[in-house]
Structure formats: C-alpha cells, structure tokens
Amino acid sequence: MKLLKLTLISTALFSTAALAQAQQSVNVYSYDSFTSEWGAGPKVKQDFEKAHPQCAINFTPFESVGVLLNRVRLEGKKTKADIVLGLDNFFLEQAEKTGIFAPNNVDLTQLDLPTKWANKTFLPFDFGNYAFVYDKTKLQNPPKSLKELVERQDLSVIYQDPRTSSVGRGLLVWMNAVYPADKIQSAWKELDKHTVTVGKGWSDTYGAFLKGEADLVLSYSTSPLYHQLFEKKDNYAATDFAEGHITQVELAARVANHPNQCADDFMAFLISPTAQKHIVTANIMLPVIQGEIEPHFDALKVQQKTQTSINPMVNTEQLKNWISTWQTTLTK
C-alpha cells in the first residue's frame, strides 16, 4: 500500500512538473489598474488559463499608457512583450509607427462599436465616452457644455497630463475639436485658472476627486456606474456636454515575430462574453461585442449610441503640436 501511495504521489508530481514545463508563457504589457488585484486582469487571466491549461499569462504593469508606449518604443523588436494591452485610438498612429505589431486573426464580425472597426492589428476590448464626473450633492448646477466648464471660474477641476495619460489626451482632442486654433490658447488659460491639479494618470486624479479636492474630474461617462453597483451610491453623475463627446476605444495588439499560439488565443478570448463581463465591470467601460454582457452597462451602451460623438481624425503631428501648445500656455 505504501509503495502504491508513493507511486501515485510520484506520478502526480511528475504530471504537475510536466504540465508546468509544457506551459507556454504569454507576456502582456498593460496599465496598472488593469493588472491590479481589483482590476480585470486577474479574473481574465484565471478564466483564460482554466480554458487553456497549457497557457500562462504574465502581466507587466505600467503607471500609464504613455509610459507603456514609451517602453515599447525603446525596446523595439527586442521587447519581451507578446501582447500590448491598453493602447487606445488616440495612440494608434504612434503605436503603428513603432513597426513592432502584427495583424491578428480575431473575427471582427463580433464587434459592435459606435463606428465600424476595420483595423486588423489593433483589437478593441472596451470603449467609453470621456466626461467630467461630479458629486450631485455638492454641485447642483453642473456645466452643460465644455465651453461652460472652461469659462466658469466657480468650478474646481482636475484632469490628467496628455503627455502621459490616455484620458488626458482625450481632453486635448476634445478641446481642439471644440475650440479653433486661434482660441485654444485662451481656452487653456481660462481652464488653468480653476484647475486644482494635472495628474500623471487616471487613478491618482480620480482618487484626489473622491477625497474632495475638486468639483469635477475628467473620467468617463461610465464612472458613476461603479459607485452605483459596487458602493450602492447614486450621488455621482457624468456631464453631458452640448458639443458632444469624444469616444475612447481601448486596444490590444500582438507583437510581430513572437510566434505564440497562447497569445493568439488570448487575443480572441479578450472579446469573448466571459472576458467582456470581467473587463466592463472592472474597467467600468462598455462592451465591444454584440449580445447581453451586463444589464447596467448594456443599457448605458444603448443610451450612449444616441449621444453626439465628435471623433476627429488625429495624426501624430497634430497631437505633438497640441501638446506643445498646451504645455507652452500653462508655463507662461
């Protein structure tokens, strides 16, 4: 009997070791709020590895998308990443210019976005409209347009640095879509007069807002859903501006010349109903596929499709010029 037990234990240990040896690793670069214990990453990883026991997902977190993209650009073709997850439509051209990403084999007919997505290299995994979030119990008269937000000196505002944050970059695009070139500097100056802080990333700025450091914070129209669903609070709301809203589409991409079947499978898994539910409820963003994912987010998605969307085509040179204008204006 002892010999049988010893044989069984040895077999089990050998099987475990063999499985570990046979596992294929997938290195995923992403932003820290996705990979954190409360983010979507661990849940997506767990369910993916359960469905694909031959695969092991390893996350490398970065404090912002800007920092992530800079790392990828520096590493170039020597990057250890198999997948880069967390770029967005406003970083798209810069990411393409790195030359390190390859087309994926994911079926795009599953996608259901406000505008048709045809890019075969960068795969959407969630989306949402930028908005300013406020506490209804503290701010009874919220701004009804971006211009009103800029001009009202009784409002205190927090937003993110467009050089390092994708959310901050969204405001940069939004401001330049609403204000003509000859008015944009004065608009930034007006906004700066009642800006409390410009933070490096979304997490620290939203945290500062929740501590009561400002009336409004740049975030997403989905953000109040977090407080409703997870904190049972309905005092937070998102602005609905007359000029329309800018939509952010978050993206994942495969690194070229890194043959890895598990990485290909993980890309496809990102837009499965299982992964989408984890992503939308942790990221507090909207699902990118058709069908029922989560009732509250599904309802908001239908509502947002009726909102005015202003999504100008923006190239890298424009963004560089806009950032330079913003930076110069704020340092004068």
From Swiss-Prot:
Lineage: Bacteria, Pseudomonadati, Pseudomonadota, Gammaproteobacteria, Pasteurellales
Species whose genome carries this gene: Haemophilus influenzae (strain ATCC 51907 / DSM 11121 / KW20 / Rd)
Functional summary from the UniProt entry: Part of the ABC transporter complex ThiBPQ involved in thiamine import.
GO CC, any one term: outer membrane-bounded periplasmic space
Main location: periplasm
The encoding gene: thiB
Highest taxon of source: Bacteria
Protein name stated in the entry: Thiamine-binding periplasmic protein
Keywords: Periplasm, Signal, Transport
Keyword Oxidoreductase: no
Record keyword Signal present: yes
Annotated positions binding thiamine: 202, 220-223
Known partners and oligomeric status: The complex is composed of two ATP-binding proteins (ThiQ), two transmembrane proteins (ThiP) and a solute-binding protein (ThiB).
